């Protein structure tokens, strides 16, 4: 009907239009004759516009007649035809295609910098026109204090001893037997204020001042282990009255995303989960009022509002809008990437984190350091867009920035200055300088106000800003500032406002969100299901690998247990069938264990999204469960199809399908179990340890390793709780109750099959098969429920951070202490600081840390090009080129004593150029010349004379600051530098970089624990400086720092340059002070092209003069930061506006010609000069490298309590459990089953704890490997000393672990107490655990990532398990596989232990189903193939295994580099 009506209307319109056109043309011809073509054209244009307008009105009238539900889903989009005619189409907004979205966004935001404000005003005007009020939120906080408890001093370091003492103290504290040794640490102290809507607030404060804690508290996301006191209200309502996590959005400074998803997919998922909020209700009311008023809305605005008001869409127009304003549209379809997967840049990743919350409907935003990694121009644009949103849409917003440029600072309405947990100022930006002048401090000319605000509370920096020369300067502390602000006019006004309660009844009903989630439960499930399916597709390699692995294992199993070798029907024939059944079972279980690593890997993103109420835990867990069911079906089917009939199991078809069902049940149970363990453990080390321990208990009590009848009576409950027992019963009953095992026997059981089941303690009726199947699926359900419960109630394990304690404060705390508190980072009081705020140095300051001699070197590069293989995702978009060019004809020169800045917008290629010049690229294709003081660069020698400060600040987490520096100096300074000189040099560098107060602080992991970002930056700089290099590359040394910390780093850099070194820095957001501290600039644009290379000049006048000579470039204003102005005027949009290519302008300039002459001069060796030469590749000898690496590994292991404390704890627990389960079995060898139980005990004792070691060590080695890549690139050591140190320290801890384990097992199992037997027992277990650890290390070295390493490890462990001699004794292994028995290290260990402990015994042994007896040693030789006389060979074989794995590990890290740069 609607289409018919619309068609009739259009026909009438066209008919009327034709008649009107004819009449008009006739009258025109009559009046003007045929002579006025101009008038005719104008009239024709006017007529066409009228017709188009009329057509638009008619189409809107048709839409307006639709029912409300349909009307809100229909919009109009215009299309400009090739002849210039505009046609309006009716579009279903729920089915917008990519092209439709692109057209709509282009029509709304053609040039985002110019059009965004106008677009937002058009949106707002539409609501204002019909009198709809937009909800607003005012946030108040009164007497807000946040604190926590922390250990201080040496107790703060997480050593094994401290961890043990802390655990004991915590347990005793629960029962009030021991007072806590923790100290109270205050993070925020009695702060009050108001965050107003429609005003954008800047939060300033040095790292450690409590900014993150403050923002989290306002957003209702304070850490659970912190004490929060005071009152926070939204429009007068406290947190319990609404859902603060959905009313507001906290944007973290840490970028946690799924690397497998593209930028667009990441934002689409966030938008889908967060929902549309009140956008749909607003649209309903808006549409109703417009219809009543007869108002026709702007079609573009109407289409946008409708497209963004429909929830549950897989992809939304709001995503396209956010991508556009954040500048992410250029990388929208590129993977986000992670540590081992190439993706977008760090700055782009930071914007993705911001965009993830902007796509949601929140009305208040608390943004934590959103500019980290962004250049000042990009930051300015993003903050400008935020300002437009705040002012036009009445949003409440607080943004924390570290180094805001003056023009970015001017965008804010209000400023909060936070220092040492107290508010120093809160109020209008315009009045902030007035307050500090009221206090006696004035901001100097050309000093950024933000920088001044950060420094004026510092004791060291404060005096330089004192302007009341008539009065003597006295230091004003932070509490004094805070108190004075309360008596300042603005402070008094805030206090007065806080005394007047907010009128809760005037609050807009849509302002505060009462629903916990943004969409319905079904939509949440669909969203998470879609994402899980996407992640599975992107990780398809893992599943293909797993499927291939199980196929290979099934093939091996069928050749080991080949049908032709498998006779059935008698008790003697059953051994191989038991082995085949148990191997199948254990293989399926181990295959499920790979789920553990994959789940732990996903948890950080899950916790972030769960806490932001994207979805509940069940919505995350159920899709994983559902989508893994087909995986279980496929993997189980592959195993059964390949093995069932080829091995020769019961031939009935029904039994084939019953075994398949059993294996599906076991596989589902295993996947669910390990998912639950991953969620409970939450970290790789803890989860791995718990996983292996659980496997151990499930297997031991499962009825195969030890039969039910031999389990202690008081532990029989464990037998019935073991899921493995039900799997074992199901497959055994299915096989042995078949007709071919029904031959009668003379024993207590009527048939052979039942005799075999009874001997193993299994059930003997068919009904128990179905009971077992029900139990397996019941366990699967239970573990999935527990998985959901763990995800719902558990939080990430609270890692610790170092806290510096004040010196000389009112509590008389001792200096140079560190304290540990969960997720707290406190700064030192400014009384403790020993820094200057400006880059120029006092005249009396000595330049320390550079006393060792060095050779000044220059670096010249000419016509450098760099290519990488074209990314697959770009090829899918139609790009045909095979290579992507990242650097294009880059040329320049860096000279001694000259500090060069390498600047460009995000993605310009700054880091790429630096990596190419420093020789840090691991892939790609490099063209062009690079010369060092006239000679072609040789990377081996260049590494000795250069330093590279990486952007990511990678360091070993478990050593202190002083140890990191001493280690670097030890390995990188010349071997003739004496130890005392080296230590003095380190001390001087620490003073230079101002790390003295942090000498004993633990480094920690970036973004997790340990040092703050700015402290880590200074450490990175110091680590390179102690190497005494001639050329230093610094990748964004000031990124992530506040202005004061950046000044400290740059002052250090300046001192370094003034000693005659060559220093190059990439830099993102330089203040005027920092930018003008550089001597020269190399400016790049997107595409990797140089657009300026030359001197800056006094106050950057040479740079300014160069760009101002280019026609059309706007002049710089007096107050502008030259760095920001430079990036603005050279941006891509400015190029498009001026129709100019700045790279081409530079290439045709005189400056370029002069630079080419300089490059030519520096590329020619000086007279009488020599090329760099070192007699050895490394500074230190092989022995010294080993000593240094071992020294660092020693401290790393001693402080890695999570790894070692858990390892020793599990060793004791497993040892005791084994001892209890196998109590005195060594003295009770009378029956064949007794000996098999003992063999099972030996097998389990070495296999499971050994596998635990192999699995747990992988995460330790993986973390250290990233540090190894940096240190190797720096030429610190060769691979063998590193491998030696890693292996040596692990071996020492294994030796201690083995002693504890051996003592427990040997004494409790009841082996014969002789020195020789105990030595053998200890030796074999020690060597076993050692080669297991070496194996874990080796697999990490050979694989690119932790997940792949876990899969590869379990694959070969299955081999070792099959050929260990337990599942199938060596004499029964087919001759074509018997060689692999000797290739299984576990087989040698079991051989060694069993032969040494019982191989010489001559006791009589009863055989199952036989009347004759046999001596133990004879049985071992005949049935198991163990000979006591072969022990010496076994002893030396273990040495061979250890050495083999060690050398493969060493050569793996030597020749394989999985770091992608």
Swiss-Prot record:
**Record CDD domains:** ABCG_PDR_domain1, ABCG_PDR_domain2
Fetch the InterPro entries from UniProt.
AAA+_ATPase, ABC2_TM, ABC_trans_N, ABC_transporter-like_ATP-bd, ABCG_dom, ABCG_PDR_1, ABCG_PDR_2, P-loop_NTPase
- Domain (ABC transporter) spans 172-445, 859-1111
| Compartment list | Membrane
Any transmembrane segments, and where? Answer: 541-561, 577-597, 622-642, 660-680, 685-705, 771-791, 1203-1223, 1243-1263, 1291-1311, 1321-1341, 1348-1368, 1379-1399, 1430-1450
Lineage top rank: taxon: Eukaryota
Binding residue positions for ATP 2: 904-911
One Pfam entry name? ABC2_membrane
Ranges where the ABC transmembrane type-2 domain occurs: 523-736, 1184-1398
| One function term, GO molecular function aspect | ATP binding
Q: Spell out the disulfide connections.
A: none
Q: Which residues bind ATP 1?
A: 205-212
Keywords tagged on the record: ATP-binding, Membrane, Nucleotide-binding, Repeat, Transmembrane, Transmembrane helix, Transport
Q: Name a GO CC annotation attached to this entry.
A: membrane
How does this chain sit within the bilayer?
A: Multi-pass membrane protein
Indicate yes or no for the key word Secreted.
Answer: no
Q: Which PANTHER family match?
A: AAA+ ATPASE DOMAIN, PIGMENT PERMEASE_PROTEIN ATP-BINDING CASSETTE SUB-FAMILY G, PLEIOTROPIC DRUG RESISTANCE PROTEIN 1-LIKE ISOFORM X1
The protein's role, per its UniProt record: May be a general defense protein.
Which family is this sequence assigned to? Belongs to the ABC transporter superfamily. ABCG family. PDR (TC 3.A.1.205) subfamily.
Descriptive protein name: Pleiotropic drug resistance protein 2
